[in-house]
């Protein structure tokens, strides 16, 4: 993560960070080794973990950025008044050179734990549209989207001009620790490109992943489906 922070500092663009991990952090701190089924325990774990997550980001960005926490629910996007307030807050923070760190409000919202957004991939696409972002970069533990042709080794697809049902059907399931996976990233890419946003999926452990993805040298690139107004 320290490497990613340094890369973002060098890129010198305004950016918003959408981060998951509150529940996992909380479970670890509470000494719980399995994902609980009880809703109240999940939400309590999220409350414990979210503060630790923000403390980690404050340390990582110390001397580089002041960070701000925004915990969102689906209502923040479905209500016109709340959505307008969200957009105003995000844009004010960016004008102040403050880094908004966004997560789902897992500690109080039942619908978010049940997947109202689906996962943070969809949330990131919604946030990108809210701030009229030029780029959405989705970092994962693989090098991009791989085409499974049923014969031999899967092939990395460097450019996907349009997300189709066939591409989604080619995806594996959810990730180990979250609700998302490659299918959810494709859906996020579809939503973002429809809003005129460039999208990249890349391996977060790759050296220089941020500038290299922005220059389309690694990962899978999705061009926008329309020109932003």
Language model region names:
Residues 1-229:
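C-terminal catalytic "cap/lid" subdomain
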